[in-house]
Amino acid sequence: MKYVHFDSLFRVINWLDTDQFDIALPDSVLPVTDAQWRYRDRECWVNPIAGKLVTTPPPGEFYRLSGDKWVYDASAFATALEQVKLQVVQSIKQYRDELTADYIVIDGNHFHSDANSRIQQMTLAKMGQAGAVPPGLMWQTKNNGLIELTNAIAAQFEVVTIEHDMRLFAVAQAHIAAVAALDDIAAVELYDWSQGWQP
């Protein structure tokens, strides 16, 4: 006897010939004729209720077999779309977090904005506002090397950091809203969320 072994989506995953081999048959099998056996090199599905082999492939990705007809599965599409959106949103949030800890810009200088730098900058902001930054204090930037840290620069740390965080949050939310509005998986995957982050 010849059989096809199929999965939960009724897709044939194995062709079994018990005449040639001593095989313990799995649960989900359907006997096939010699004529049907000719299709063993093609992708096939089964209609177990009618005992039929389906050789016509689905017309698209989100179709399921109902009897021996392919029907569009809107629920499967919606689930897949939601999963892709979640992945893109996660990437947007991760990028936002990386930029948050990257740098802030004051007078064209890029100052580190990781957690340790922010702690130092809070104190420096108070010193700058009070005019208490020592003259000649040199500070490392990400783009211009060592620069003299003046009271005018130091006084801006707090406000610029808050503006930086608020801007990145707003940009992330705008990208997340744009992704949420898309109703096509390819459009979600191709959406370019890399724009508009840093000044």
Go through each PLM region and give its residues.
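A preference for well-ordered globular domain cores
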Residues: M1-K2, D7-Y39, N47-P199
